[in-house]
Amino acid sequence: MADLAKIVEDLSSLTVLEAAELSKLLEEKWGVSAAAPVAVAAVAGGAGGAAAPAEEEKTEFDVILTDAGANKINVIKEVRAITGLGLKEAKDLVEGAPKAVKEGVSKAEAADIKKKLEDAGAKADVK
């Protein structure tokens, strides 16, 4: 166990360049590639044609404002709070619906943003 602890300590002290070189050396010595499993998994998922598992693995979502509704002022205020945009930018986004309000967020955050927009009187979708 003491040897393993020393190995962990040595690996922790490596710079990024040293770690990359170590990775290359180990790939050559063991005859493996760190990128191969990722490529194989992507090809296998695409070849199977199963759309449902691909959706289950989705981790980033976009919140789309589909309609501002009758109460645009509240929606603009909410868009400003969510995005940090200025008044003019938020107004342009709301009036230009359908537009993405927030992109690449977690499922929970997307649901929260959608609820806030709907509470303000807008219609929104999570994609």
UniProtKB/Swiss-Prot annotation:
The keyword Ribosomal protein applies. Keywords: Ribonucleoprotein, Ribosomal protein. Pfam families: Ribosomal_L12, Ribosomal_L12_N. GO terms for biological process: translation. It comes from the Bacteria. One of its GO terms (cellular component) is cytosolic large ribosomal subunit. GO terms for molecular function: mRNA binding; structural constituent of ribosome. The keyword Ribonucleoprotein applies. InterPro entries: Ribosomal_bL12, Ribosomal_bL12_C, Ribosomal_bL12_C/ClpS-like, Ribosomal_bL12_oligo, Ribosomal_bL12_oligo_N_sf. Belongs to the bacterial ribosomal protein bL12 family. Homodimer. Part of the ribosomal stalk of the 50S ribosomal subunit. Forms a multimeric L10(L12)X complex, where L10 forms an elongated spine to which 2 to 4 L12 dimers bind in a sequential fashion. Binds GTP-bound translation factors. This is Large ribosomal subunit protein bL12. It comes from Rhizobium etli (strain CIAT 652). The gene is rplL.
